[in-house]
């Protein structure tokens, strides 16, 4: 009989962290973080990274594993999960996936498109073109070759622009066509996924604003200031494009006022939550939806997982 993998998804500020600790204790699990921002070292406050005290003795994985200058793709995530699950099971524990990066969950559920691997020389050529003519030029080039892909990719998203152009240069085919081909990877096991959603969206919005202001009190700007000193980082770096960090960077660059930074940071976080909830709605026929306000949510999730 195939092993089961358990999952808890939800929008930012929905209470995933504290609930996941309770669940992990009940089912004897280790937690694998499903969060594209928690992988970065030195980005603790703005990502609401669980402290050792908050982890409460539960082993966590895929937290603080790379520098902010690096990238951690969906493929990297899937590969890591497939390696970690075996190690966790060998220790006699269950696997509990927890987070809000829905592209990571999507990769586990659906697998990845069979795209060619990255080639260093092509990346270097694209980097040279970007320095010479700018990222907007590369996005324009993509639009001329593959308008369908260009339309879906933000003109400031260097990682995805580079990847789309790289795939086109290697394969000679449109990126938008290749991503529709057969999928590879993902999980071999069944994923029992629960998702927290708010009955009242205004409660989630209040949680988001409250947590953002709490982060400021905890020294979030000092954290970003420390990152800002690194000449290898810009506001277009994948890590710095994380919600809150991008807006703080603009403030430190002098592009916006402090009040604008706070307002934009809160709005951007609410927009992130809206996108996360859209993903969850699209999956609602195959996952278990639990109201974040529900006082019996822990018991309801345990029952869905098959525990009493």
Swiss-Prot record:
Its EC number is 2.5.1.75. GO terms for molecular function: ATP binding; tRNA dimethylallyltransferase activity. Its cofactor is Mg(2+). Belongs to the IPP transferase family. NCBIfam families: miaA. This is tRNA dimethylallyltransferase. ATP binds at residues 10-17. InterPro entries: Dimethylallyltransferase, IPT, P-loop_NTPase. Monomer. The record marks 101, 123 as: Interaction with substrate tRNA. Keywords: ATP-binding, Magnesium, Nucleotide-binding, Transferase, tRNA processing. It comes from Francisella tularensis subsp. holarctica (strain LVS). HAMAP family: IPP_trans. It is an enzyme of class 2 (transferase). Residues 35-38, 159-163 are annotated as: Interaction with substrate tRNA. It comes from the Bacteria. Pfam families: IPPT. Substrate binds at residues 12-17. It catalyses: adenosine(37) in tRNA + dimethylallyl diphosphate = N(6)-dimethylallyladenosine(37) in tRNA + diphosphate.
């Amino acid at each position: 009989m195939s092993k089961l993998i358990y999952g808890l998804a939800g929008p930012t500020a929905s209470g995933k962290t504290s609930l996941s600790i309770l669940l992990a204790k009940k089912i004897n699990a280790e937690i694998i973080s499903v969060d594209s921002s928690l992988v970065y070292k030195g980005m603790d406050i703005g990502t609401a990274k669980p402290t050792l005290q908050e982890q409460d003795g539960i082993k966590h994985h895929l937290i603080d594993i790379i520098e902010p200058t690096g990238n951690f793709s969906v493929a990297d995530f899937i590969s890591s999960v497939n390696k970690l699950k075996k190690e966790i099971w060998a220790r006699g524990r269950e696997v509990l996936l927890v987070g809000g990066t829905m592209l990571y969950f999507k990769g586990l559920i659906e697998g990845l498109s069979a795209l060619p691997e990255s080639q260093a020389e092509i990346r270097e050529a694209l980097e040279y073109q970007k320095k010479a003519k700018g990222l907007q030029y590369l996005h324009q080039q993509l639009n001329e070759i593959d308008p369908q892909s260009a339309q879906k990719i933000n003109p400031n998203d260097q990682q995805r622009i580079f990847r789309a152009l790289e795939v086109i240069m290697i394969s000679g085919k449109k990126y938008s066509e290749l991503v529709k081909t057969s999928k590879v990877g993902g999980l071999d096991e069944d994923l029992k996924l629960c998702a927290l959603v708010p009955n009242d969206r205004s409660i989630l919005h209040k949680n988001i604003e409250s947590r953002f202001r709490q982060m400021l009190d905890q020294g979030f700007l000092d954290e970003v200031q420390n990152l800002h000193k690194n000449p290898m980082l810009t506001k277009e770096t994948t890590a710095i494009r994380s919600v809150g960090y991008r807006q703080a960077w603009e403030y430190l660059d002098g592009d916006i006022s402090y009040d604008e930074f706070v307002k934009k940071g809160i709005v951007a976080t609410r927009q992130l939550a809206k996108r996360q909830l859209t993903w969850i709605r699209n999956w609602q026929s195959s996952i278990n939806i639990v109201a974040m306000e529900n006082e019996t949510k822990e018991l309801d999730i345990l029952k869905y997982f098959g525990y009493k």
